[in-house]
Design a protein with these regions (language model features):
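Conserved catalytic core of the tyrosine transesterase superfamily
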Residues: 1-300
Length: 300
C-alpha cells in the first residue's frame, strides 16, 4: 500500500488550518479514515485510487452487520466523503466514489435525559469536604447549568469564567465562541471549588496551569476523566442508570424547552449552527405529558 500516512497528515492539517476544526473533530476524522485503511488491507486493496463504489458498499455492509448505530455509520461516511473530496482537490484522485453514497436516514430517537429526582440524587453524592468531591459537584452543576459539551467543559480556562456576571466563554465546534450564563447553584459550587478544592489538587504535585477542571494529580481533566467521575458516582446509588456526560446537555435543553424557553434562545445557548439540531429536544417528558393530560382530558 502507498504511503497513506502522508495523505492523512495533509488532511489533518487541512482540517485544522483551513476548516478550523476542533481537536475532537479532527481525531474523529482520523480514526474513521484509519479504520477504513484496515478494511482496505483486509480486502487486499493496495491504493486509494483503486477504491470502487462496490468496495464502499461492502464496507458499509460490514458496518451494518456489526449493528452500529446509524449516526455512527453516518459519521464514518461523512469523514470518508470529506477525505476523498480533499484527495480529489489535491488531484491525487480523478473521482470521489463516496459522492455516490447517501447518508442513512436519521433515527427519530428521543434523547436520554435526567428527571429531576435523578439529578437531585446525583447532585447529593459528592463529598464536599474533599477536594475531589468539590470538583465533582462543581463539574456536574456547570454541565447541567450551561448544557455545554463535555469537550467544551474540559477546555474552559480560568480567564473564561466570569464569576461576577455568572457567565462562561465557551469555545465551541469550529472554534466558534459563545457566552453561556449559569445560575446560583453552579456559582456556589464553583466558588467553593476554586477557593479550596482546585488549589489543593494543584498543590499535590506542584502543578500550575489555568485549566478550570483538574484531575486527582492536578493535571487538566479530560473527557475520559469526566466519564470516570460519572461512573464512580453512579456506583454509589441503587440505580441501574446507564448514563453518559452528554445527558446533561440533553437534560439542559429538555428542561428549558419544557419550561417555556423559546427554541432560538436554546439554539444559541447550545451553540447549534442549525435549528434542526435543536428541534430534536422539542419532545416533552412523560411527566409533562401526564400533567397536561390530567389537566385537560375530561375523563382523566
Amino acid at each position: 500500500m502507498e504511503n497513506v500516512k502522508n495523505f492523512l497528515n495533509l488532511f489533518v492539517d487541512y482540517l485544522q488550518i483551513e476548516r478550523n476544526c476542533s481537536q475532537y473533530t479532527t481525531v474523529n476524522y482520523a480514526t474513521d479514515i484509519k479504520e477504513f485503511y484496515v478494511f482496505m488491507n483486509e480486502e487486499g486493496i493496495g491504493e486509494l485510487r483503486d477504491i470502487t463504489y462496490q468496495d464502499i458498499r461492502l464496507y458499509l455492509t460490514k458496518l451494518h452487520q456489526k449493528e452500529f448505530a446509524r449516526t455512527y455509520i453516518s459519521r464514518k461516511i461523512s469523514s470518508l466523503r470529506s477525505y476523498f473530496k480533499f484527495l480529489l482537490r489535491e488531484k491525487y484522485l480523478q473521482e470521489n466514489p463516496f459522492s455516490l453514497v447517501s447518508l442513512p436516514k436519521k433515527e427519530q430517537r428521543i434523547p436520554n435525559f435526567f428527571y429531576e429526582d435523578d439529578l437531585n440524587e446525583l447532585f447529593s453524592l459528592s463529598d464536599l469536604s474533599t477536594p475531589l468531591g468539590q470538583r465533582d459537584q462543581a463539574l456536574l452543576e456547570l454541565l447541567y447549568a450551561t448544557g455545554i459539551r463535555v469537550s467544551e467543559c474540559c477546555d474552559i480556562r480560568l480567564q473564561d469564567l466570569d464569576m461576577y456576571l455568572d457567565t462562561v466563554l465557551v469555545n465551541g465546534k469550529g472554534k466558534k465562541q459563545r457566552y453561556v450564563p449559569f445560575g446560583s447553584f453552579a456559582h456556589e459550587k464553583l466558588k467553593l471549588y476554586l477557593e479550596d478544592g482546585r488549589i489543593t489538587l494543584l498543590n499535590k504535585q506542584n502543578n500550575h496551569h489555568d485549566m478550570l477542571f483538574v484531575n486527582h494529580r492536578g493535571g487538566p481533566l479530560t473527557t475520559r476523566g469526566v466519564r470516570h467521575v460519572l461512573n464512580e458516582l453512579i456506583k454509589k446509588t441503587s440505580k441501574t442508570l446507564h448514563i453518559h456526560p452528554h445527558m446533561f446537555r440533553h437534560t439542559f435543553a429538555t428542561h428549558l424547552l419544557n419550561g417555556g424557553a423559546d427554541l432560538r434562545s436554546v439554539q444559541e445557548l447550545l451553540g447549534h449552527a442549525h435549528l434542526s439540531s435543536t428541534q430534536v429536544y422539542t419532545h416533552v417528558s412523560k411527566e409533562h405529558l401526564r400533567k397536561s393530560y390530567l389537566s385537560h382530558h375530561p375523563r382523566a
